[in-house]
């Protein structure tokens, strides 16, 4: 199991006005799903961000600025890596997530 700086990631996300709802492996899920944060295993001081395909451009720009400002205060960086889609799987209580890198 790899060490990932979840505490600092949570601080950055909360400072940007959002709440962590769930973590799974290298992914951090945010309340209302405007973004998914992924730990960068190649650069421990970087967090990769994927925007929900349904997130409006103006909202995405505000979120990006808040995340980058909060990360900089903690000597971290944010890399906007792509978008993601979420869909309910048929017949089961599972969600499928597709990361769509730029």
Feature map (PLM): residue ranges:
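Short secondary-structure junctions
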Residues: 15-23, 77-81
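Generic hydrophobic, helix-prone segments enriched in Leu/Val/Ile
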Residues: 12, 37, 66-70
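Intrinsically disordered, low-complexity regions
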Residues: 10, 15, 33-36, 60
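Short amphipathic alpha-helical segments
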Residues: 1-8, 59-63
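Ser/Thr-rich, low-complexity intrinsically disordered terminal regions
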Residues: 19-38
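Amphipathic alpha-helical segments
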Residues: 4-20, 71
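C-terminal basic regulatory modules in eukaryotic proteins
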Residues: 42-102
């Amino acid at each position: 199991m790899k060490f990932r700086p979840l505490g600092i990631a949570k601080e950055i996300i909360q400072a940007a006005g959002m709440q962590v709802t769930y973590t799974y492996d290298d992914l951090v899920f945010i309340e209302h799903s405007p973004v998914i944060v992924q730990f960068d295993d190649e650069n421990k001081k970087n967090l990769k961000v994927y925007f929900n395909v349904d997130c409006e451009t103006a909202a995405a720009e505000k979120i990006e600025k808040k995340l980058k400002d909060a990360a900089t205060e903690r000597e971290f960086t944010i890399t906007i890596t792509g978008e993601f889609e979420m869909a309910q799987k048929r017949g089961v209580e599972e969600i499928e997530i597709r990361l769509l890198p730029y």
